[in-house]
Amino acid sequence: MNFNTSLVIMLLNLKMSVDRRNWLKHGCNLRLVILVLWLVCYVSNGQTIGDTSDFNNPAVLPLVTQMVYRSLSNSTAALNRELGIRAKFCVKDPDADWNRAFNFSSNLNFLSSCIKKTQGSIGKRICTAAEMKFYFNGFFNKTNNPGYLKPNVNCNLTSWVSGCEPGWGCSVDPTEQVDLQNSKDFPERRRNCMPCCEGFFCPRGLTCMIPCPLGAHCPLATLNKTTSLCEPYTYQLPSGRPNHTCGGANVWADIRSSGEVFCSAGSYCPTTTQKVPCDSGHYCRMGSTSEKPCFKLTSCNPNTANQNMHAFGIMVIAAVSTILLIIYNCSDQILTTRERRQAKSREAAVKKARAHHRWKAAREAAKKHVSGIRAQITRTFSGKRANQDGDTNKMLGRGDSSEIDEAIDMSTCSSPASSSAAQSSYENEDHAAAGSNGRASLGIEGKRVKGQTLAKIKKTQSQIFKYAYDRIEKEKAMEQENKNLTFSGIVKMATNSETRKRHLMELSFKDLTLTLKSNGKQVLRCVTGSMKPGRITAVMGPSGAGKTSLLSALAGKAVGCKLSGLILINGKQESIHSYKKIIGFVPQDDVVHGNLTVEENLWFHAKCRLPADLSKADKVLVVERIIDSLGLQAVRSSLVGTVEKRGISGGQRKRVNVGLEMVMEPSVLFLDEPTSGLDSASSQLLLRALRHEALEGVNICMVVHQPSYTLFKTFNDLVLLAKGGLTVYHGSVNKVEEYFSGLGIHVPDRINPPDYYIDVLEGVVISMGNSGIGYKELPQRWMLHKGYSVPLDMRNNSAAGLETNPDLGTNSPDNAEQTFARELWRDVKSNFRLRRDKIRHNFLKSRDLSHRRTPSTWLQYKYFLGRIAKQRMREAQLQATDYLILLLAGACLGSLIKASDESFGAPGYIYTIIAVSLLCKIAALRSFSLDKLHYWRESASGMSSSACFLAKDTIDIFNILVKPLVYLSMFYFFTNPRSTFFDNYIVLVCLVYCVTGIAYALAIFLQPSTAQLFSVLLPVVLTLVATQPKNSELIRIIADLSYPKWALEAFVIGNAQKYYGVWMITRCGSLMKSGYDINKWSLCIMILLLVGLTTRGVAFVGMLILQKK
């Protein structure tokens, strides 16, 4: 700064401080002004003042101090520009950080004291920008000890003056000009050495003074004769210099190397020369420049370094627990109230519908009775006698038919609920809807009302239930009247506009052969026949006969097999997958959601698989009809249950399993042993429901095992298979005994025919009369009976053809090794082909020929969302356990691991990453590992996989947001780091999102036990790799690919940003050692989210590839 600039600034300061009148009043004259300007000029240019008394003048010293401070600020600003590039990784805002460290404008007393002490030569003793740069550049060299500097022009092996010792400094020659902003050259500074001023530090190896940063305490040292140390610092007096005394501070570095310079914990340092104990009700961390008030509900004694925030942690967890309890209880209460109201409406509708049909039956009976009496009286008695009989009828309360009709109609209209319900199935009945608002009545006669459709009339829940149960009761009445009704009669009866037509499908197959690709074994061979709509076809045979294989081949689910022959649909060669929306497949295992009720399971499939344009009233009718026909009314509101939690009985569960496919109104229904494990009554109830479906035109094919005679006679057709997948019989059930009798196979008395035929095919029954036909010849007999071509090997020697084994060769070691290698290679190839076929099958696209438009993906996402939300609500105890474990983990880690200022809390964050990753991964595995079978079944039926995946991920967002809050409620308030709660919460949310995606992938690609093992192993291994020194390129690459590295960096950066002032070197040193960049906090967050999103994509692709349809 030149003289003219100094003059202008001085005049402005004088103008601002006092006005002209005060100047004259205090007797200031021209001589004082000239003296002040001269002093400022010399001090600012690094000159000394000969007369010390001039600096004791109160009017001169503040002005000179301001000028020195401006020069010092300019030099530190120049140093900031020089070091800003190298320190970019640890300084986010250079100006702000430098201002927090060297902005002494609030109190310049230490400068004034130093001006007095140095007799005005302070400008010649302060380090230039080049010397400061020389000192600070040493910290970027990892091998350099901050206590020692390299030799330089002033301190070297040939020149080591007293100012080179720690805590001392020297001045330049009095005639030499010093430019503090010079960042290139060292001035020769070896004269007039003296102890360092308070508020400055003089490093060993430099002869100049550097101002201590804010947050430091740099008093003059005093000699401790016991330890020979210059306290509070750690340097000793040099040997051989008896006149040398303790000086000032000697170093400013990281907390490990220069902890004595930092303002001690429990105190704060408003200036670098003043330390004040912390008052009661306040706390002061190490390196503080001011005391901070403690929060309410916390107690802070004097000299407190940190406040106890355990109470806030308890309050947070109490608030979170309260909110969760409110959410769960309110949701459960809402669901319970809704279900209770629906149950009341349903029960009322059932009572009214049954009462109405009882009245209708009574009316019909009365009509027939009156008609019979009239006819009898007319034939036997006179008119007078007939009049007497009429009086008798009146006495009995029965009038003529018109009076009865009027009475019944009036009783029907007397109920407000029944008067407003839309009754579309009544025949030749008029219902008047008389409301309180005086609307005109509507006459409904099984057709649309003029100006209004049924969909518009059926609005309320009561009306919908009444509509459904009136239809159900009418169907029951019709079934009772037409017990022997045939399929053609049903078709004729279904011509009214109320009945929806189902797509009729006939399946026919010719020379159907199924061969395993792995070993070439034929599981089906030359199977020919057909399955017609409106009929129930039973597939029977001994074990290994290929019953399930036939069902899978017809349903298009045979994977890993080579299929030959023809499968025709309605006489056309089309893919069965084109009709998957109207084909139901009931697996042998009861794949039903155990944490849903019976009604909820059925309703979910109805919503997702019934036509999208079907009205709600018709959907209610479908579901209620299935519940009623399967006898599930008593348990409709009961949870199905799981292995761990008991629910409904096994027979009821089996019926629910069948109802999931019946509720979508299929055209073809395949069932794999639906009666296994059921008693006779349950089996009959199930077959009665299937019989009703068949009467509506459904083509039903089912595998059964040893049915009773009653169930056997319920079937329309029978497919009997022998071992090896050969057909023994395919035709009507009523003609099976006739056919086998023609072969000389007669069923003994009191023996169930299907059991006897199975024993014959198993070879258990040896004697079969005088026919001389062996059980192995029965398939060939059936082919000859139907006129099919018999394969050559069967014609020659059927049994030998089935039992011939390939030559295994000799037992020589060479052949054995070649055989083993050949078998191993064959197994590898077969496994590869099987996986390829599964992937190809999963991604098979077929033209939709079902003519059914199911709900869109977005609508199915909504249904999945509601179902999964209910399941999570019913897993409240399990969720509470997860939260409790996280709570305990946060409390334990927060209590055992204290936040360290030296490492910015890195050890605690390392254990946090391991604990939270491990616990959240294991919990997230349940989202996909527990219901793989359910997903495979739903996906095979045509439900959207993306809707299922997105719904589960959406519901898990609740845990992703809540679990970090639960953990931090203990960990954060126990450790009380300098970073904010919000910063820690954001990082932890992103971490949980990341590990949840990884858990999805593990759950889908691995078995549950293996997935749990990897969930424990991955966080530990990846965290250890991420915290290892990056000495090799491989370790660095692996660390960059592991999510713990980015989570830990985000945690440390968030905490390091709150350390400034005296902590600047510590912050830069720690970040440089770890390889972190303070500007990459957002990048770390984005990478965690990207990993979570990528792993979710991988999990979704795996879900599509690995699904078993």
From Swiss-Prot:
Claim: Ligase is one of the keywords in the record: no
Chain positions recorded as ATP binding sites: G541, P542, S543, G544, A545, G546, K547, T548
GO molecular function, one term: ATP hydrolysis activity
CC per GO annotation: membrane
Region ranges (Disordered): 378-399, 411-439
Every ABC transmembrane type-2 domain range: 859-1059
Transmembrane segments: 877-897, 904-924, 954-974, 986-1006, 1007-1027, 1085-1105
Stored Pfam families: ABC2_membrane_7, ABC_tran
Listed SMART domains: AAA
Family annotation (CDD domains): ABCG_EPDR
Topology in membrane: Multi-pass membrane protein
Keyword vocabulary terms for this entry: ATP-binding, Membrane, Nucleotide-binding, Transmembrane, Transmembrane helix, Transport
Subcellular location: Membrane
Keyword Kinase on entry: no
Chain ranges of the ABC transporter domain: 507-749
Segments of skewed composition (Low complexity): 411-425
Family per similarity comment: Belongs to the ABC transporter superfamily. ABCG family. Eye pigment precursor importer (TC 3.A.1.204) subfamily.
PANTHER family attached to this UniProt entry: ABC TRANSPORTER G FAMILY MEMBER 24, ABC TRANSPORTER G FAMILY MEMBER 28
UniProt-recorded name of the protein: ABC transporter G family member 24
Organism per entry: Arabidopsis thaliana
Source species taxonomy: Eukaryota, Viridiplantae, Streptophyta, Embryophyta, Tracheophyta
